[in-house]
Amino acid sequence: MKIGFVLPCYNEFENIFILIKQIKKIFNNHLIVIVDDSSTNEIKDKIIKYKKIKYFKRKAKSGRGSAVLFGMKKILQDSKIDLIVEMDTDLSSHPKELPKNIKYFKRKKLDLLVMSRYLKGSKIKNWPLKRRLFSFLSNKLAKFLLRVNVSDYTMGYRIYSRSATKHVINNCGKIGDGFIVLSEILAELNLNKF
């Protein structure tokens, strides 16, 4: 099984290399696609030394959601990739739980699995109070509006099937290009019975 990782980033110079090392320590058969949303720091020169990584720097800041959709398109060019993992690069999540979550994903034959900061035993790391409050309120609003059975609507740590990813890149990104795409993806996949 080959896994594709989509890592949208913006000014995450230190964190991106920590995350890459964490992923490489756990997974052998993978491709990492980094979509740099026009960071002011230069990571390309350090990224080149890594194998199994494709790096794309966008000319202008276009938003996290459009970065993820762009990364998904690039990942799907590799026909051997079975699962796509979306992860934020701010180190708020760690890939060490992924093997267990991937087993669950495959056993249940899911098309989407969203990790959560709001389930029992979950933790939010490295976040100031303002960001925690914004996330909490955004989730409450999304839950009220979308009514999709997930506990964390704004979590950027997800596993997608190849078919769900194809559907996402063909049907999402129409209502915005930032964090709203996270909720748009949930609504779109739920509406289409994924």
Segments and roles (model prediction):
Residues 2-4, 31, 184:
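Cell-envelope/extracellular polymer assembly enzymes that use nucleotide-activated donors
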Residues 11-25:
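Short, well-formed alpha-helical segments that are part of the catalytic scaffolds
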Residues 80-90:
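Short beta-strand-to-loop acidic/aromatic patch adjacent to the donor-nucleotide binding site
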Residues 12-15, 39, 94:
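Donor nucleotide-sugar binding loop of glycosyltransferases
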Residues 30-39, 58:
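Short beta-strand/loop segment that forms part of the nucleotide-sugar
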Residues 54-74, 95-179:
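Acceptor/aglycone-binding surface of glycosyltransferases and processive sugar-polymer synthases
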Residues 36-44, 91:
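A conserved acidic beta->alpha catalytic loop
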Residues 174, 186-194:
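Catalytic donor-sugar/metal-binding loop of nucleotide-sugar-dependent glycosyltransferases
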